[in-house]
Amino acid sequence: MSYKIVALPGDGIGPEILNGSLEILQQLSKEFHFEYELESHDFGGIAIDNHGKPLPDSTLNACKNADAILLGAVGGPKWTDPNNRPEQGLLGIRKALGLFANIRPTTVTNGTSHLSPIKEERVANTDFILVRELTGGIYFGEPKQLSENDALDSLTYTRDEIERIARVGFELAQKRHKKLTSVDKENVLSSSKLWRNVINEVSQSYPDVEVNHLLVDACAMHLITNPSQFDVIVTENLFGDILSDEASVIPGSLGLSPSASFSEQGPRLYEPIHGSAPDIANQDIANPFGMLLSVAMCLRESLNEDKAADKLENVIYQLIKEGKTTRDLNGNYLTSEIFNYVKENL
């Protein structure tokens, strides 16, 4: 079977970290005998320069017909028109593809625990996934109102929205350690009362998965004091936005965190969580690990190449353990050198 992959290098450090990662993907495809077709398209600021908008029709059509999308990074200070921002392309692609679930792994290995700002004994063996609902909640609820003296935001969720994000969480938990933690604010929010009820109902279809409920404030505390207790966390949009940023500091660098966005049946989008870092672009000093780990997620979740994903992840964490890292991880290695080391160790 041949897969269709669309590459969106984007802006800033995006092209250099994605293009190097695509060479790694090609090497893995030869070793593990899988085939794919690759297309590269403009997206974000570069698309504004070349096409007048951040998400050209040609890019969107290619994404709709893909099995997976790999995104480098988007944005930068060059593009200042508030009505035509590079980041609007990301919002557009999420909406067009129905990307409703954001998946954020947080992993700390024996070789990376020294990088964390939290004590090593607290973060040792941390390995969890945070599943955030992307399309509902207070960011999108209606009505919204702003006046000089008062303001209104609406936190709304439907049963269907909660059920579909719950199933993503339970499916991931079934493939991992069979533990799911649902995070809400059930003690004060009506939307969270519905959230908890639906989670409990969906859990009946997954009797092998252990379910726990945590209030969001308690979860925020446990992420710092005992992050290794978690396997899969599932939560709504606002809580997930905050908790995923909190979780991103646990490994010690934004450059170590991949992410994915899932639709119900269409293509999935994979990207590192860091920004475009235009101040270090084209200097061969960008950290490529987040992009490489996003490729590993793509291998596992979209291409069903678990062994290739495992091998790539193992090589990455071994290099970090050996201190072969970029300067943001206190290393002295160039981006190109990291890619060469990955190729050699594969």
Swiss-Prot record:
The UniProt record gives the binding positions of Mg(2+) as: D217, D241, D245
Q: Which reaction does it catalyse?
A: (2R,3S)-3-isopropylmalate + NAD(+) = 4-methyl-2-oxopentanoate + CO2 + NADH
User: Could you tell me one molecular function GO term of this UniProt entry?
Assistant: NAD binding
Keywords noted in UniProt: Amino-acid biosynthesis, Branched-chain amino acid biosynthesis, Cytoplasm, Leucine biosynthesis, Magnesium, Manganese, Metal-binding, NAD, Oxidoreductase
- What SMART domains does its record include? Iso_dh (SM01329)
* Pfam families recorded: Iso_dh
Q: Relay the cofactor remark from the entry.
A: Binds 1 Mg(2+) or Mn(2+) ion per subunit.
Q: Tell me the cofactors it needs.
A: Mg(2+); Mn(2+)
Q: Tell me yes or no: is NAD among this UniProt entry's keywords.
A: yes
Q: Where in the cell is it found?
A: Cytoplasm
Enzyme class, spelled out: oxidoreductase
Kindly report the protein's main subcellular placement as a broad class.
Answer: cytoplasm
Q: Cite the EC number.
A: 1.1.1.85
Cross-referenced PROSITE patterns, in alphabetical order? IDH_IMDH
Carries keyword Cell inner membrane? no
Share what the entry says about its subunit structure, partners included: Homodimer.
Q: What does this protein do?
A: Catalyzes the oxidation of 3-carboxy-2-hydroxy-4-methylpentanoate (3-isopropylmalate) to 3-carboxy-4-methyl-2-oxopentanoate. The product decarboxylates to 4-methyl-2 oxopentanoate.
- NCBIfam families reported in the protein's UniProt record: leuB
Q: Provide the family line.
A: Belongs to the isocitrate and isopropylmalate dehydrogenases family. LeuB type 1 subfamily.
Q: What name does the UniProt record give this protein?
A: 3-isopropylmalate dehydrogenase
Species source reads: Staphylococcus saprophyticus subsp. saprophyticus (strain ATCC 15305 / DSM 20229 / NCIMB 8711 / NCTC 7292 / S-41)
